[in-house]
């Protein structure tokens, strides 16, 4: 028997309780791009399952699930990065590379999705949005490991705020600082 916890690979999936399953379904499929892979049947509540796509084009059993809450369920305040409520702050969704991320960010802007924050972190370049139920979503691509691996604390503490509207919100530079090493372009 081990005397300490075994480190997991990571988070497997996220389940969100939502007000209106159809509205949330459209957001997560048409705006974010997840694919619906399953739906619970013969249950007293509605729940659907969604998957992203791996680099090999494969789907999983689910990365995300949406469960419709009863009408009397309490809502939440508008999303903010500051912890003003107990529960989920945000979920981060990664695109495979800078080019696909830039296409997604432009797509979001063209669809009228409000950018709440646009930030270059020390390990990601990110846009923060919210879903129809106010869940915070970080749309990101990860910078190369050599940018942050020698000083994770330094990378976590780096934050460059960028414009959230107009063409400026779509500009992404590759002159990233390197934490604990020489400069690398993403």
What kind of region is each of these model predictions?
Residues 6, 17-68:
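Core segments of cupin and vicinal oxygen chelate
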Residues 13, 47, 62-64, 90, ...:
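Histidine-centered active-site/metal-ligand motif
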């Amino acid at each position: 028997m081990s005397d300490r916890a075994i480190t997991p690979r990571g988070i497997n999936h996220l389940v969100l309780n939502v007000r209106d399953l159809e509205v949330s379904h459209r957001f997560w499929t048409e705006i974010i791009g997840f694919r619906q892979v399953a739906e619970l049947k013969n249950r007293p509540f509605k729940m659907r399952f969604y998957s992203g796509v791996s680099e090999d084009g494969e789907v999983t059993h689910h990365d995300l699930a949406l469960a419709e809450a009863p009408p009397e369920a309490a809502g939440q305040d508008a999303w903010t990065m500051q912890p003003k409520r107990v529960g989920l702050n945000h979920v981060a969704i990664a695109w495979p590379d800078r080019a696909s991320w830039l296409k997604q960010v432009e797509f979001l802007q063209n669809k009228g999705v409000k950018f709440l924050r646009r930030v270059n972190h020390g390990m990601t370049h990110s846009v923060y949005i919210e879903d129809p139920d106010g869940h915070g979503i970080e749309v990101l691509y990860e910078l190369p490991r050599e940018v942050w691996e020698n000083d994770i604390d330094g990378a976590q503490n780096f934050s460059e705020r960028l414009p959230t509207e107009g063409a400026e919100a779509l500009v992404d530079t590759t002159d990233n600082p390197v934490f604990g090493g020489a400069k690398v372009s993403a």
